[in-house]
Amino acid sequence: MPSFDIVSEVDLQEVRNAVENATRELASRWDFRNVEASVELNEKNETIKLTTISDFQVKQLVDILREKLVKRGIEAGALEIPEECEHSGKLYSVEAKLQKGIDSVMAKKLVKLIKDSKLKVQTQIQGEQLRVTGKSRDDLQGAMALVRGADLGQPFQFNNFRD
């Protein structure tokens, strides 16, 4: 029986490259001259800390980072960015979290979405991924198109396609 897995993964090496590119752009941008601003990746916690002297510039930093991530092939939805900036002393900062894995709530939403579509496939939650099994390849491709088309706020990848 053909099957595939739905996962949500982020390549940390590409994130590191995007952060370095954003830092490089910070050094050359006119509006960030003589401004204390930084973009730091914490690989252990899988977070990116954006720090600068005003909340407006934090939003600019977020836009720069998103642009660099998209150029490196990482969807902007892979970053979970809080609306409010933290203010400490003279600096504003935002700690963006990388979304990796499919949590149980999102997995249940995906299962419900696929079951409500009346496709002839079965879904199983396996930890932080979802296994979709069907009798025909066409049904599986329909499920892939359905998941791609759904706006669930998190990017998904498909791997381990078996025939």
UniProtKB/Swiss-Prot annotation:
SUPFAM superfamilies: YajQ-like. It comes from the Bacteria. One of its GO terms (molecular function) is nucleotide binding. InterPro entries: DUF520 (IPR007551), UPF0234-like_C (IPR035571), UPF0234_N (IPR035570), YajQ-like_sf (IPR036183). Pfam families: DUF520. Keywords: Nucleotide-binding. GO terms for cellular component: cytosol. NCBIfam families: PRK05412.1. Belongs to the YajQ family. Nucleotide-binding protein. This is Nucleotide-binding protein NT01EI_1072. It comes from Edwardsiella ictaluri (strain 93-146). The lineage of its organism: Bacteria, Pseudomonadati, Pseudomonadota, Gammaproteobacteria, Enterobacterales.
